[in-house]
Amino acid sequence: MTRGNERTGFRVDPGEFRVCPLRAHAFLHDVPLEDVWAIRLRGGGAGRTIQDVRAVFIAGVEAAPAIVTGLIRLRRRIGALLGWDRQRPGWHAESFVHRLSPTDRAQSTAAPGIPDGRLSLLYRFDKEQLSELRNGTVHAFSSLSMRPTPGGYLAYLAIYVKPVHRFTRLYMAAIAPFRRLLVYPAIIRKVERGWAERYGDSRVG
């Protein structure tokens, strides 16, 4: 198991994540797991839900450092120039929304298919949500989940990537250093601090 009790957000071994009782494991059983990040959420009290985590996460993205927002803008400009993000008629048929069971739909607290930032929501349960993104480079999935700990909660951000052509792996390899060294660590620090500020715990450095 990953050791990081005194650290802020850190990457987690996939095996540690897979033992968590999440719907995403079965739902995405045939989709490669790219990486997993743990987010330490100190405080918060009982009864917090994934919607609370999502709200702080969105605020963390919006408050990301200039280098991170600059990288995001650069990716969007390149995507617009090369047509990566232009929606194609056939992509709807590839959406994993068609995998949702009647139970998934009944238990989701938000309607499948609604926008979730630049992604599309598949389901949102009390402690877990899953969204997808289909563009010209990847068919990606973002799993956000949480579990209680003695001092608050531990959230997991897991990224799954289904290749859409041979370019997908090259693309993911090219952006991996930026994602893993700059983007995710910076956003996760903002999320952890934002959670501490919102719920009255100032121990996050």
Predicted segment positions?
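Hydrophobic side chains in beta-strands
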Residues: 39-41, 133, 159
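Hydrophobic-ligand binding "helix-grip"
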Residues: 106-149
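Short hydrophobic helices that act as membrane-entry/anchoring signals
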Residues: 69-80, 168-176, 180-183
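Intrinsic-disorder/low-complexity, polar/charged segments enriched in Ser/Thr/Lys/Arg/Asp/Glu/Gln
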Residues: 34-38, 128, 154-156
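Active-site-proximal cofactor/substrate-binding loop regions of enzyme domains
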Residues: 204
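Hydrophobic ligand-binding cavity/cleft-lining segments
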Residues: 2-107
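A conserved amphipathic terminal alpha-helix motif
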Residues: 172-201
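Beta-strand/loop substructures that line and gate deep hydrophobic ligand-binding cavities in soluble
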Residues: 135-173
